[in-house]
UniProtKB/Swiss-Prot annotation:
Cofactor(s) demanded: Zn(2+)
Residues that coordinate or bind Zn(2+): 132, 135, 152, 155
Catalytically driven reaction(s): N(6)-acetyl-L-lysyl-[protein] + NAD(+) + H2O = 2''-O-acetyl-ADP-D-ribose + nicotinamide + L-lysyl-[protein]
GO molecular function terms noted in the UniProt entry: histone deacetylase activity, NAD-dependent; NAD+ binding; zinc ion binding
Protein name: NAD-dependent protein deacetylase
Broadest EC class assigned to this enzyme: transferase
Gene label: cobB
Taxonomic source organism: Staphylococcus epidermidis (strain ATCC 12228 / FDA PCI 1200)
Length: 246
């Protein structure tokens, strides 16, 4: 990676006080979670089994066959041993230093919360929370996994992860909070997102601040509008930043 890019990123971060982070699947790759749509990711694995990933992750699947839906998320989505990596930790650290307004994420893995971030807008929900589809009793991921819980202890109905399934709308309260963050940011740092999945990716066009920074292995549709673009391994980039500040 180019040293001038690292220095420019450091300067932008140091001179900003209202940073907003926008993160995609690339942020969690170093934690051992492949991009859903990448080779070896969840979609690839499901497709090899001759099934439709979009259907298995849909509200229709839940309505059509509750038992099948429950078994699917227990077998495919609940992963116990994945930990936040240096990128999640850096984002949380800047929030704790009051340099950041928070993070907007397309990810459902809950690793930003695990890393210590507090002001998180999870556009597609999170696997850290579950709720009953009948009485809305809430459960944590750890409780669900420890007790192999599939049905509500209060009413006996199905519990589901608090994620946005295909066929469901994004939570409008979360959307408005995310847009408000972006509109008040002086710097927007995009990490590990191709910025092609709508409507979430379109949020970037709402940014009117000073510096748009994009760090992603591949090009994005917004590269030409950015103050700084780094096409490199994200973990290496952030390690360089963290080590230079220590």
């Amino acid at each position: 990676m180019k040293k001038p890019d690292i220095q420019q990123l450091k300067d932008i971060v140091n001179n900003s006080n209202q940073i907003v982070f926008f993160t995609g699947a690339g942020v969690s790759v170093a934690s051992g979670i492949p991009d859903f749509r990448s080779m070896g990711g969840l979609y690839d694995e499901i497709s090899k089994d001759g099934q439709s990933p979009e259907y298995l992750l849909s509200i229709d699947h839940l309505h059509d066959n509750k038992e099948s839906f429950i078994n699917f998320y227990h077998e495919r989505l609940l992963i116990a041993d994945k930990k936040p990596n240096i990128v999640h930790q850096w984002i949380a650290q800047l929030e704790n230093q009051q340099k950041s307004l928070g993070v907007i994420t397309q990810n459902i893995d809950g690793l930003h919360e695990d890393a210590g971030s507090h002001n998180i807008d999870e556009l597609h929900g999170t696997l850290n929370r579950f709720y009953c589809i009948n009485c809305y009793e809430e459960y944590s991921k750890s409780y669900v996994m420890t007790h192999h819980l599939k049905y509500c202890e209060k009413c006996g109905n199905v519990i589901r992860p608090d994620i946005v399934l295909y066929g469901e709308m994004l939570n409008q309260k979360t959307v408005f909070k995310a847009l408000d963050k972006i509109q008040h940011a002086d710097t927007l740092i995009v990490l590990g997102s191709s910025l092609v999945v709508q409507p979430a990716a379109g949020f970037v066009s709402e940014f009117k601040g000073d510096n748009l920074v994009i760090i992603n292995r591949d090009a994005t549709p917004y590269d030409h509008t950015a103050s700084l673009v780094i096409h490199d391994d994200m973990t290496s980039v952030i390690e360089e930043i963290v080590n230079s500040n220590s």
